């Protein structure tokens, strides 16, 4: 019995092969199979956001002006979430809420679900694009793995959190000031800054910034003089075979500064990948917990003592009172349909006031 080993070749190209050749052709902007998801979704998400911030009011959903047409600027314009009464409706243009009326669809907040869903798929398409290109040029897929961090944060904040609450209403609106207000909401209603997952996220993001600054400075400090150029960018040939900077010198420097240093480039760069991506994933997990109304750290003993002893107060008890004030003010403003009324005497006052 004879077994022939070799690559199977087809006599004719089928439709898939033709599509594959065209999509993955070497061109200025790579398209690829991932581009079939990325480019349309990114186009619709950005187009929806620009349309909403330019023309669409939030009067019917939040009682607010939110467009350039109404006098907002770049920092205050937003594509606002649908009203609380619409719960988790997808708000399809042809759905029972808008019934094909584009103006009514915009008034109800349909652009928010449109931008959120297309934005999520666009981000996923961008990650798949990195996978596809890495496979094409035989690279490892760590760029795509790193980009999973921002995707996890986006999906957890804009989709999973409101799904755990009563509706899309409680997700962030797509705007700068709107995101700031959402952060205040997270603090007031979830005590987010005292959540251990938030702490890990802050450590990851700020730690990554520190690592980038240290790494960039160290490389600049230990560059070899490979040429007589006037600055860093002209002093070496981009196609040179030898190293650009001295890892040995950098290792000796940081060993003297800290007593420890990275011994090789692989471990150094893996650590620079690990710190921010892990921080983003931890933040995303924390937001998933908030969707289920899981609580942050509670120091009840301090709260009880502050309630009993007029002279005892900590930064923690002051922050708890601040959170109560945020809830009292924001709930009445954000949820007028609940007819919430908080008399002056029930608003929180700290012992120091």
Curated annotation (Swiss-Prot):
EC assignment: 1.10.3.9
UniProt-annotated binding residues for chlorophyll a ChlzD2: 118
Transmembrane portions of the chain: 41-61, 125-141, 153-166, 208-228, 279-295
Cofactor note (record): The D1/D2 heterodimer binds P680, chlorophylls that are the primary electron donor of PSII, and subsequent electron acceptors. It shares a non-heme iron and each subunit binds pheophytin, quinone, additional chlorophylls, carotenoids and lipids. There is also a Cl(-1) ion associated with D1 and D2, which is required for oxygen evolution. The PSII complex binds additional chlorophylls, carotenoids and specific lipids.
Entry keywords, A to Z: Acetylation, Chlorophyll, Chloroplast, Chromophore, Electron transport, Iron, Magnesium, Membrane, Metal-binding, Oxidoreductase, Phosphoprotein, Photosynthesis, Photosystem II, Plastid, Thylakoid, Transmembrane, Transmembrane helix, Transport
Sites where the protein binds pheophytin a: 130, 143
Name of the protein described by the UniProt record: Photosystem II D2 protein
Organism: Aethionema cordifolium (Lebanon stonecress)
């Amino acid at each position: 019995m004879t077994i022939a080993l070799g690559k199977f070749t087809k006599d004719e190209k089928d439709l898939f092969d033709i599509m594959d050749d065209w999509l993955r052709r070497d061109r200025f902007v790579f398209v690829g199979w991932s581009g079939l998801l990325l480019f349309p979704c990114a186009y619709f998400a950005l187009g929806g956001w620009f349309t909403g911030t330019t023309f669409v009011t939030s009067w019917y959903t939040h009682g607010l002006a939110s467009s350039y047409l109404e006098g907002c600027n770049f920092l205050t314009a937003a594509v606002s979430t649908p009203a609380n009464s619409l719960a988790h409706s997808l708000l399809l243009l042809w759905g029972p809420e808008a019934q094909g009326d584009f103006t009514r669809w915009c008034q109800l907040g349909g652009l928010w679900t449109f931008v959120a869903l297309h934005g999520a798929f666009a981000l996923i398409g961008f990650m798949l694009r990195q996978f596809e290109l890495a496979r094409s040029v035989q690279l490892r897929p760590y760029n795509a793995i790193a980009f999973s961090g921002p995707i996890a944060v986006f999906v957890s904040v804009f989709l999973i959190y409101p799904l755990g609450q009563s509706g899309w209403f409680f997700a962030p609106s797509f705007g700068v000031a709107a995101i700031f207000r959402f952060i205040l909401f997270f603090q007031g209603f979830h005590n987010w800054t005292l959540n251990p997952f938030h702490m890990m996220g802050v450590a990851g993001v700020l730690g990554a910034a520190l690592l980038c600054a240290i790494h960039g400075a160290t490389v600049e400090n230990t560059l070899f003089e490979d040429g007589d150029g006037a600055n860093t960018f002209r002093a070496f040939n981009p196609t040179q075979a030898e190293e650009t900077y001295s890892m040995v010198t950098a290792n000796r420097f940081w060993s003297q500064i800290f007593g420890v240093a990275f011994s090789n480039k692989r471990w150094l760069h893996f650590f620079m990948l690990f710190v921010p991506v892990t921080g983003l994933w931890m933040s995303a997990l924390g937001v998933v917990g908030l969707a289920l109304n899981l609580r942050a750290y509670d120091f009840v003993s301090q709260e009880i003592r502050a309630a009993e002893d007029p002279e005892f107060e900590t930064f923690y008890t002051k922050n708890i009172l601040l959170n109560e004030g945020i809830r009292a003010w924001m709930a009445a403003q954000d949820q007028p349909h609940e007819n919430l009324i908080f008399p002056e005497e029930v608003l929180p006052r700290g012992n120091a006031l």
